[in-house]
Structure formats: C-alpha cells, structure tokens
Amino acid sequence: MSTVHEILCKLSLEGDHSTPASAYGSVKAYTNFDAERDALNIETAIKTKGVDEVTIVNILTNRSNEQRQDIAFAYQRRTKKELASALKSALSGHLETVILGLLKTPAQYDASELKASMKGLGTDEDSLIEIICSRTNQELQEINRVYKEMYKTDLEKDIISDTSGDFRKLMVALAKGRRAEDGSVIDYELIDQDARDLYDAGVKRKGTDVPKWISIMTERSVCHLQKVFERYKSYSPYDMLESIKKEVKGDLENAFLNLVQCIQNKPLYFADRLYDSMKGKGTRDKVLIXIMVSRSEVDMLKIRSEFKRKYGKSLYNYIQQDTKGDYQKALLYLCGGDD
C-alpha cells in the first residue's frame, strides 16, 4: 500500500518526465510568429520620439525565449546593430533590466546573475544561493558551460574566491550539478539511514558535522530527500528547517534553508521569495525581476497557484499594487494572468 506522499512523489516525477516544464510556464511560443516583422516593429518603436515602450514590451514578453533569439538575429541582420545594445540605449530603469534579461538564454541569464552576485566588493549571497540551490543538474551543467564561455573562467573558481568555510563547500558541491537523478526505485533503507545520519550529525550531538549534511543534501535525488526529511521527524524533535536554524548560522544557515525549501516544494519556495520581495514598504525589485524572468517559461503557473493558496491574493494582484508603468505591464505579462 503506497502512502499519499509516495504517490504524489511518483506523480511529480512522472509529471516532470512526461510533461515538459514549459507546460507550467506562463509564457508560451507565439503562434503566428514572424521574426522579421517583430524586428521591424521593434526597430520602429526604438526610433519613435520618446520610444514606444508599449510595443517593445508587448512583443518581447509574449514570445518564447527561442523566438526572442530569432528576433535578435533578424534585428541584427536588418540594422547591423545588436538588439540588446539598441534596447539598452532606448530604455532605462527596471524596465530595461527586465527586457535585457528576456533577451538572454536561460543559462546566459543565470550565468550573468551569478557573475553580478560575485563582482566587486562583497557578495550578493541571496542571488548566489537562490540560483545554485534551485536549478536542476541539467540547468547547472549548462550554466557552468555558458559561464566559462562568457567569462573565460570557471564558475567554481569564482565561487571559491568569493566565499569561505562550509558555505563555500556547500555552494561548490551544489554548483557541480551532480545530484542523483530521481529513480523509480524507492530505497527505504537508505532513506532511514540518511534521516538518522542527518539527526546524528546535528541535533543529537554537540556541534554539527556539516560535511555529513552537505554530502547527503547535495548528492541524493530530490524525491529521495523529500522522504528523508519526512522520516527525519521520527528521529528529531525538530523538523529539518528548525534543526538548521538551531545548528548553523549566517550564510550557511541561509543556504541550507533555501536548499531544503527548494527540495520540499520549489514553486512554493519561489512564491515565498516573491511575497518577501513585495511585502511591507518598498519593493526588492532585483529579486522580483530575477524570478519573473527566470521562471516565466518553467513553472510560473505552479508558483502562481502556491502564491494564491498561501497568501490569499494573486501574484498578479500583488505586482499590480507594487509596481507601475511599462515595468508593471512587463511583469504582468510574464505573470500571465490573474488567479
């Protein structure tokens, strides 16, 4: 007799294999796509006195990433100029950030966000943690390849020179993208062993055996770890998130918390990040933009439903209240609708 959790886990696995991720994206390929026509319309919009931002937003937020690459190619053929640099000159502020982000491939976007998080003085640990903890093996391997292509250095090298201690070890291990893939066989003995090892390495003893935590949480498959965290509760008086808060501090604590939340429910993790970026006074636009751009073709529909379920109001509604102008329009198109 399978438990509900196993059935859900199996469904989510099968779902992930049989349903392309884009099925949960809010941005789909445009049906009557014509790259030449789009390139011409964007060229006209850029040349318009005062710049016709509405046309630029309408076109680029309603095309798939692949289609945007075709538009950029057609634009360069037409004008002998790069679309990205033409738009950089024509736009400004948060809208510019969104539009330039949409022109990059997903791996280029992640690579450039990672580079920016480690450039200059200080590290933007939040961005580094979010990307490294939430991307799949395949995505991470592609990011590593593109990062080297773009910056002529290894992502791992940059992480090593920009971080330290156990936090560095965790980031380096995750960035390799070598986690076991979800299999169809459930190994109950290993689930139990891992749960006990996590408990023995942390809450049960004085001090924390961080390398043990790192090896289990970066090497096992997502589905396996979901079961491990469930099982963990039968050994520990605290769940995994509470244990992390008790055992480690600083960037390491932050990274483990992000990682466990991503493993437990990735769309909910992003829904929480989006909520945090807009709650209270002011908006953390950097976080908001990065998620809206990077998840729009991956799992935005799932993120929206988790957001509505947890916060009682739609993501669309929150964005409407928190942003304005063509920047708002661009984000709402990426959101893909109200719930």
From Swiss-Prot:
Residue segments, region S100A10-binding site: 2-24
Processing and modification events after translation: ISGylated.
Location in chain, cross-link Glycyl lysine isopeptide (Lys-Gly) (interchain with G-Cter in SUMO1): 49
Residues where Phosphotyrosine is found: 24, 199
One GO term describing the cellular component: melanosome
Conditions for induction: (Microbial infection) Up-regulated following infection by classical swine fever virus (CSFV). Up-regulated by the presence of CSFV envelope glycoprotein E2 alone.
Residues that bear N-acetylserine: 2
Modified residues (N6-acetyllysine): 49, 152, 227
Annexin repeats, residue ranges: 33-104, 105-176, 189-261, 265-336
Gene Ontology molecular function, alphabetical: calcium ion binding; calcium-dependent phospholipid binding; cytoskeletal protein binding; phosphatidylserine binding; phospholipase inhibitor activity; S100 protein binding
Phosphoserine, modified sites: 26, 184
Record-listed cross-link Glycyl lysine isopeptide (Lys-Gly) (interchain with G-Cter in SUMO2), residues: 49
Presence of the UniProt keyword Nucleotide-binding in the record: no
Subcellular location: Secreted, Extracellular space, Extracellular matrix, Basement membrane; Melanosome
Protein family according to the UniProt entry: Belongs to the annexin family.
Subunit structure, interactors included: Heterotetramer containing 2 light chains of S100A10/p11 and 2 heavy chains of ANXA2/p36. Interacts with ATP1B1. Interacts with DYSF. Interacts with COCH. Interacts (via repeat Annexin 1) with PCSK9 (via the C-terminal domain); the interaction inhibits the degradation of LDLR. Interacts with CEACAM1 (via the cytoplasmic domain); this interaction is regulated by phosphorylation of CEACAM1. Interacts with APPL2 and APPL1; targets APPL2 to endosomes and acting in parallel to RAB5A. Interacts with S100A4. May interact with UBAP2.
Name of the protein in its database record: Annexin A2
Organism whose genome encodes this protein: Sus scrofa (Pig)
